């Protein structure tokens, strides 16, 4: 019974299913077989090559710092993804920057040996300096002249480091004093005459006297610098490729770059007349300059103060021609021979044969390509300063005739009065100097002053010359000085009250009038560094001859004794 009921139920369910819609077909199943990836090795980064640069820490601190700054900028700019450059403290580097003779020059640093200006000796031997440094201070007793005292060397830390690189470690000595840079000069002056200093060439100034070392004078353009023993040559050495890149990127630095130097030779009285002219006729027109020509032609600017006009009808010279003067135009050959560049016209004999002689004289100078100042075709021309730029140094010359006679007028040629309304009033010169100084010029001012036949200056002379320096002149020159006179030296500039005759030699009544000085002023990077004094005696009524060492020392002692040092 139970079985029959179950079968009936199952049959009913089947019949009910037959009445529904067609069934949804079952979708086909697609089977995709994926390949198993083959594992790839992780790439190893290629190391970037590194080149190292080492800067010697023993270099003077100022130079070391300058190099580090320049090289830091270089490594940043020159590094690439393919090569890095780094500065290192390890001397075991690809490139070493240090003192040496090999490699690419980066810095040439010249040291100067100097003493206070009123020092009589002109130089020393390098061997003496080496012995002094090694602990023998008596090796340089000659620097104190007749005192015979072992001197003290004053220098700052950078100069000490530089000398240590050149000479080795110094001996412990009270005669070697390392002081602050600003104290070197005042301490040397306080301890003169037994004191000297070593400092960078470009830090010289007028209160120092540059000393020669083994006869090498750094104030000479032609100085054999390769023979000078106190020059640091800092070079890059090592990997040639990197060294070449450094040399191309970092222009070499030189603190005695001749392209930045200007030498101006200032001279005393020229008057090609009387005994001097007689000797020129007898022995040749260039005879007076033959012994000192090199002092003049090696300057960048050679100054001549010619007090006399040329005239083609000038009477033949004689020893008794007196004080009315003219010169044969042929004598201009002497001025050519010494390399004249600038002619001063403050002299008081330009009109001796009439003002008409001056214009043709000026035309002669212009044909030679020479420039003039302190006089001119008229008042405006005479008062006009002469300006020029020499190797980047801005120079200005200004001069006036304080003493008198042949002053230029509005329509007459002549020498420049010191002021248009009053030839002895210096206010016009002072204002002009101030203006030129404000414009960046190194002003050289000259005065045709009252003539004195003694070494000392007068109170009025000291006052008037100092007024021009106080206005801004770095050099003040007494062009009137038939007799050589002393100096006034201060931080503001150099005054020479009288340089003496040069090509005017028959004033035989006075030894001082037979003495001449050529003041070779040195400018560097538009700054006045100081003066190189040349000394001579005029012989044979006409010819300056360089003094021997004893004669020169005697003259310097005389002049220093009557000079002012501030």
Please state what every model-predicted region is.
Residues 47-254:
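Flexible loop/hinge segments at secondary-structure junctions
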Residues 247-566:
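Acidic, metal/ion-coordinating pockets
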Residues 10-13, 17-50, 561, 565-566:
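Ser/Thr-rich, Proline-interspersed low-complexity disordered segments
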Residues 1-7:
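Bacterial N-terminal signal peptides that target proteins for export
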């Amino acid at each position: 019974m139970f079985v029959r009921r179950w079968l009936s139920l199952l049959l009913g369910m089947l019949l009910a299913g037959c009445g529904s819609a067609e069934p949804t077909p079952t979708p086909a199943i697609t089977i995709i077989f994926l390949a198993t990836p083959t594992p790839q090795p992780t790439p190893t980064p290629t190391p970037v090559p590194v080149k190292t640069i080492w800067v010697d820490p023993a270099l003077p601190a100022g130079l070391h710092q300058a190099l580090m700054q320049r090289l830091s900028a270089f490594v940043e700019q020159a590094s690439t993804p393919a090569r890095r450059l780094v500065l290192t403290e390890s001397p075991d580097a690809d490139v070493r920057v240090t003192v040496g003779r090999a490699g690419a020059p980066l810095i040439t640093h010249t040291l100067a040996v100097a003493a206070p200006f009123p020092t009589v000796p002109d130089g020393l031997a390098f061997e003496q300096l080496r012995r002094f440094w090694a602990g023998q201070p008596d090796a340089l007793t000659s620097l104190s002249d007749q005192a015979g005292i072992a001197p003290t060397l004053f220098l700052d830390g950078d100069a000490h480091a530089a000398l240590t690189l050149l000479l080795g470690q110094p001996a412990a000595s009270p005669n070697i004093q390392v002081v602050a840079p600003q104290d070197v000069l005042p301490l040397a002056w306080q301890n003169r005459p037994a004191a000297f200093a070593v400092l960078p060439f470009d830090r010289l100034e007028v209160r120092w006297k540059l000393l020669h070392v083994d006869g090498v004078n750094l104030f000479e353009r032609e100085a054999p610098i390769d023979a000078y023993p106190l020059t640091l040559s800092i070079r890059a050495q090592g990997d040639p490729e990197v060294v070449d890149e450094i040399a191309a990127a970092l222009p070499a630095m030189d603190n005695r770059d001749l392209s930045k130097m200007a030498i101006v030779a200032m001279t005393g009285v020229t008057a090609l007349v009387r005994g001097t002219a007689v000797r020129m006729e007898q022995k040749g027109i260039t005879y007076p300059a033959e012994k000192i020509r090199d002092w003049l032609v090696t300057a960048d600017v050679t100054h001549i103060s010619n007090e006399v006009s040329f005239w083609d009808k000038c009477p033949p010279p004689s020893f008794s021609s007196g004080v009315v003067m003219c010169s044969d135009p042929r004598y201009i050959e002497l001025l050519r021979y010494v390399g004249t560049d600038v002619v001063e016209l403050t002299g008081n004999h330009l009109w001796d044969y009439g003002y008409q002689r001056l214009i043709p004289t000026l035309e002669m100078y212009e044909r030679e390509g020479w420039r003039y100042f302190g006089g001119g075709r008229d008042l405006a021309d005479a008062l006009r300063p002469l300006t020029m730029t020499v190797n980047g140094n801005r120079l200005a010359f200004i001069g006036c005739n304080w003493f008198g006679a042949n002053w230029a007028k509005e329509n007459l040629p002549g020498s420049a009065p010191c002021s248009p309304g009053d030839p002895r009033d210096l206010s016009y010169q002072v204002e002009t100097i101030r203006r030129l100084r404000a414009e960046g010029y190194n002003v050289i001012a000259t005065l045709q002053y009252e003539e004195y036949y003694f070494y000392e200056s007068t109170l009025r002379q000291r006052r008037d010359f100092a007024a021009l320096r106080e206005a801004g002149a770095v050099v003040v020159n007494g062009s009137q000085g038939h007799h050589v006179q002393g100096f006034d030296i201060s931080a503001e500039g150099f005054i020479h009250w009288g340089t003496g005759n040069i090509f005017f030699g028959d004033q035989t009544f006075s030894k001082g009038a037979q003495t001449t000085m050529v003041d070779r002023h040195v400018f560097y990077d538009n700054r006045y560094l100081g003066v190189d004094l040349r000394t001579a005696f005029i012989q044979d009524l006409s010819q300056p001859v360089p003094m021997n060492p004893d004669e020169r020392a005697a003259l310097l002692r005389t002049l220093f004794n009557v000079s002012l040092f501030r």
